[in-house]
Each structure stands twice: as structure tokens, then as C-alpha cells.
Swiss-Prot record:
Pfam families: MMR_HSR1
Species this chain originates from: Nitrobacter hamburgensis (strain DSM 10229 / NCIMB 13809 / X14)
Binding residue positions for Mg(2+): 52, 74
Protein name (database record): Probable GTP-binding protein EngB
SUPFAM superfamilies associated with the record: P-loop containing nucleoside triphosphate hydrolases (SSF52540)
PANTHER family for this protein: ENGB-TYPE G DOMAIN-CONTAINING PROTEIN, MSS1/TRME-RELATED GTP-BINDING PROTEIN
């Protein structure tokens, strides 16, 4: 499947992520964020949806972001910086909806997530990851509502496509599109990915190459 990205963009995306990516900063709170710089792209989503794994798949570096089978792995806003000439950062976010953590911690993560999404001018795009097996839940809607209020452009990425049959995937994608009609600030189109197989990863890289191109103009 192609998601509309042409060969030139796919190549630009490939080059962007073939460059050197490294960890630069971890913020446990809104007060400790790095100074705003360049183009920032954040990955949000429920705990365990595959945010950190997708960052690893994009950068081709299997251990850049810490992943875990247990929800609640990423507990801070983690910043990764791309090649110097690109001036781009990826932000791995803590997951939301992690029910078995202490209440105070859930509240503090949730507040950090919403504050970051509302108040970060250098944030150029947020990818909201949704598990292909589950689709959009109420807890995701809260994030979409926050994003509707912020000026940042955002897009839904269905993850773990390898876990779902093709027919079910098509239904889930369609249902997700239908739900998005209620969120005019969202990209109407939905990306489908698997960090395990690499499905959809070149298209996501291409989308980011396009975004950076738009910001450098
Ligand atoms: N089958 C399959 N499993 C995946 C995929 N991506 C991630 N996983 C698994 O899902 C689990 C969670 O992955 P993470 O990348 O740590 O998820 P996260 O969203 O960063 O989780 P938190 O940091 O806890 O919010 C791990 O066991 C991964 O191996 C995928 O594309 N396919
Ligand atoms: Mg994580």
C-alpha cells in the first residue's frame, strides 16, 4: 500500500533517517524541557501502543528508545536529535491510560502530556498512535480534544498492523477515519504501521521529510 508519498519523498525520508540520531534530553516535568529549537515531532498514545518501538523502527536503531512488554516504560519526555542539517527532533512521550500505576504518577504523567501538547511552539506535528487491535478509545479522545485546542497538526498512526488480519485492518482504518471526521484539526488520513515488519515505516519517514521541507522554506 502507498499512502500517497511519491518516490522522491520516500527517498528524502530514507536519507533523513539514515543519518545520525541520538538521545539529547529527558524531561520529567514541564519545567525541565530543553529550549525550543528546530522542528519537533512527538509520538503520543496509550501505554504500550508502540511509541518507543516506532522511533526505533524509524531511526533503524533498535535500542535508541527504551521499549518494554510492560506498560509504563517511558516515564519522561525523551528527546532525540537528528542529523545537524535537518534540525529535527523526535519526542518519545510517556503513555497515558496506564491503569496499574499509582494514581499520583498517572496524574502527573497525564498533566505533563497535556501541558506539553498545548504549550510547545516548536512542536510541528504530533503522531497519535493507536493500537490496530483496539482502535480509538475514550482515553485517546481526551488527547485528540487537547490537540484540537492546540495549534499543532496531528495525525493518527495505527500500530502493530502485523497483529491484525487484512480485512480487520481495513475495517479498523475506515472506522478510525469516520471518528476523525469529528476532529477537523486532525489529518483526515490514517497511517498504518508495524515496527515489527517495517510496514508503513518508509511512508512515515516520507511524511516527516515533507514536514521538514515545509518548515525550512
Ligand atoms: N507485534 C508487534 N508488537 C509491537 C510492535 N511495536 C511494539 N510492539 C511491542 O509492544 C510492546 C510495547 O512497545 P513500546 O514501544 O515499549 O510501547 P510504548 O508505547 O513506548 O509504551 P510506554 O513507554 O510504556 O508508553 C513491546 O513488547 C513491543 O515489542 C509492532 O509493530 N508489532
Ligand atoms: Mg515508550
Amino acid at each position: 500500500m502507498t499512502t500517497g508519498a511519491d518516490a522522491d519523498l520516500i527517498e528524502r525520508g530514507r536519507k533523513l533517517f539514515a543519518g545520525d540520531w541520538q538521545f539529547i534530553w529527558a524531561s520529567p516535568s514541564i519545567e525541565t524541557l530543553p529550549p525550543m529549537a528546530g522542528v519537533e515531532v512527538a509520538f503520543a498514545g496509550r501505554s504500550n501502543v508502540g511509541k518507543s518501538s516506532l522511533i526505533n523502527a524509524l531511526t533503524g536503531r533498535g535500542t535508541l528508545a527504551r521499549t518494554s512488554r510492560t506498560p509504563g516504560r517511558t516515564q519522561e519526555l525523551i528527546f532525540f536529535e537528528g542529523p545537524k542539517d535537518a534540525d529535527v527532533r523526535l519526542v518519545d512521550m510517556p503513555g497515558y491510560g496506564f491503569a496499574s500505576a499509582p494514581k499520583a504518577r498517572i496524574a502527573s504523567w497525564t498533566s505533563l502530556i497535556h501541558k506539553f501538547l498545548l504549550g510547545r511552539a516548536s512542536l510541528a506535528r504530533v503522531y497519535v498512535l493507536i493500537d490496530s487491535r483496539h482502535g480509538i478509545k475514550d482515553i485517546d479522545q481526551a488527547i485528540l480534544t487537547t490537540l484540537d485546542r492546540s495549534a499543532v497538526s496531528y495525525q493518527i498512526v495505527l500500530t502493530k498492523a502485523d497483529e491484525v488480519k487484512a480485512t480487520e485492518m481495513a475495517e479498523r482504518t475506515e472506522a478510525t477515519r469516520t471518528l476523525l471526521a469529528k476532529h477537523p484539526a486532525a489529518f483526515p488520513d490514517v497511517l498504518v504501521t508495524s515496527s515489527r515488519t517495517g510496514y508503513g515505516v518508509p511512508e512515515l519517514r516520507a511524511a516527516m521529510a515533507r514536514l521538514i521541507g515545509e518548515h525550512q522554506r
